[in-house]
């Protein structure tokens, strides 16, 4: 990935809960959970 220009990389304490973090996790966590549930269902034999 390309690095940001040196002007924007001033050392500071970056927040964890950004809009990008929120968007990635609200989409990613249910997707991973759903894929895990589908994978687990493949091994269920009734």
From Swiss-Prot:
<dbReference type="InterPro" id="IPR006216">
    <property type="entry name" value="PSII_cyt_b559_CS"/>
</dbReference>
<keyword id="KW-0479">Metal-binding</keyword>
<keyword id="KW-0408">Iron</keyword>
<feature type="transmembrane region" description="Helical">
    <location>
        <begin position="21"/>
        <end position="37"/>
    </location>
</feature>
<comment type="function">
    <text>This b-type cytochrome is tightly associated with the reaction center of photosystem II (PSII). PSII is a light-driven water:plastoquinone oxidoreductase that uses light energy to abstract electrons from H(2)O, generating O(2) and a proton gradient subsequently used for ATP formation. It consists of a core antenna complex that captures photons, and an electron transfer chain that converts photonic excitation into a charge separation.</text>
</comment>
<keyword id="KW-0602">Photosynthesis</keyword>
<keyword id="KW-0472">Membrane</keyword>
<keyword id="KW-0813">Transport</keyword>
<dbReference type="GO" id="GO:0031676">
    <property type="term" value="C:plasma membrane-derived thylakoid membrane"/>
</dbReference>
<keyword id="KW-0249">Electron transport</keyword>
<keyword id="KW-0793">Thylakoid</keyword>
<dbReference type="GO" id="GO:0020037">
    <property type="term" value="F:heme binding"/>
</dbReference>
<keyword id="KW-1133">Transmembrane helix</keyword>
<dbReference type="GO" id="GO:0005506">
    <property type="term" value="F:iron ion binding"/>
</dbReference>
<dbReference type="InterPro" id="IPR013081">
    <property type="entry name" value="PSII_cyt_b559_N"/>
</dbReference>
<keyword id="KW-0604">Photosystem II</keyword>
<keyword id="KW-0349">Heme</keyword>
<keyword id="KW-0812">Transmembrane</keyword>
<protein>
    <recommendedName>
        <fullName>Cytochrome b559 subunit beta</fullName>
    </recommendedName>
</protein>
<feature type="binding site" description="axial binding residue">
    <location>
        <position position="25"/>
    </location>
    <ligand>
        <name>heme</name>
    </ligand>
</feature>
<dbReference type="GO" id="GO:0009767">
    <property type="term" value="P:photosynthetic electron transport chain"/>
</dbReference>
<dbReference type="Pfam" id="PF00283">
    <property type="entry name" value="Cytochrom_B559"/>
</dbReference>
<comment type="similarity">
    <text>Belongs to the PsbE/PsbF family.</text>
</comment>
<dbReference type="GO" id="GO:0009055">
    <property type="term" value="F:electron transfer activity"/>
</dbReference>
<comment type="subunit">
    <text>Heterodimer of an alpha subunit and a beta subunit. PSII is composed of 1 copy each of membrane proteins PsbA, PsbB, PsbC, PsbD, PsbE, PsbF, PsbH, PsbI, PsbJ, PsbK, PsbL, PsbM, PsbT, PsbX, PsbY, PsbZ, Psb30/Ycf12, peripheral proteins PsbO, CyanoQ (PsbQ), PsbU, PsbV and a large number of cofactors. It forms dimeric complexes.</text>
</comment>
<dbReference type="GO" id="GO:0009539">
    <property type="term" value="C:photosystem II reaction center"/>
</dbReference>
<dbReference type="InterPro" id="IPR006241">
    <property type="entry name" value="PSII_cyt_b559_bsu"/>
</dbReference>
